[in-house]
Amino acid sequence: RKREAFIREFIPIFQSFYSFISQDREKVGLSYDSHARDASLLEVLKESRARDQIMGYSLRGVHKDELNMLLGDFPIKREGSQGQNKTYLVALKLAQFDFLKRTGTTVPLLLLDDIFDKLDASRVEQIIKLVAGDSLGQIFITDTNREHLDRILHKVGSDYKMFRVEQGTVAEMKEEEA
């Protein structure tokens, strides 16, 4: 029941991030299917215990619950483009970040690792607008394309530091290097 309550609270946050990034071009959703929806979890486990013992593993329970990720009314994994799937993932992560920030006692860090791969320019620009604001706090962005990263940082216009990682060594880049 708590998982279902969480999903009900989480969906609008997630949808608002996806809607912003995609500029309202697509509708997305999440649904939670639980084995214990019509009966208590204890009843579900008791009912399947004999079969579970024969099989050697549990066939029902919370570990078998499904979180359905939808683009319109269809599974995004099967129907979405690579860019739509990436947008979905980014929106999920931003919604998780926002949820943790609002419900937790500390502000989490946000790591966007090679985030702009597979995204068109308009989606990248929308993500930049989101991360440029003060609402997200400290953010780490990685990208293997230096020119691409320079364009992104120029658009953000916020304070930032740039680091180079070579052979496991991290060094801050001086302004003239950046």
Label every model-predicted segment.
Residues 1-109, 118, 122, 126-138, ...:
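Conserved NTPase motor "head" modules and their coupling/switch loops across ABC/AAA+ ATPases, GTPases
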Residues 113-115:
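Walker B catalytic acidic pair
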Residues 142-144:
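H-loop (His-switch) motif in ABC-type P-loop NTPases
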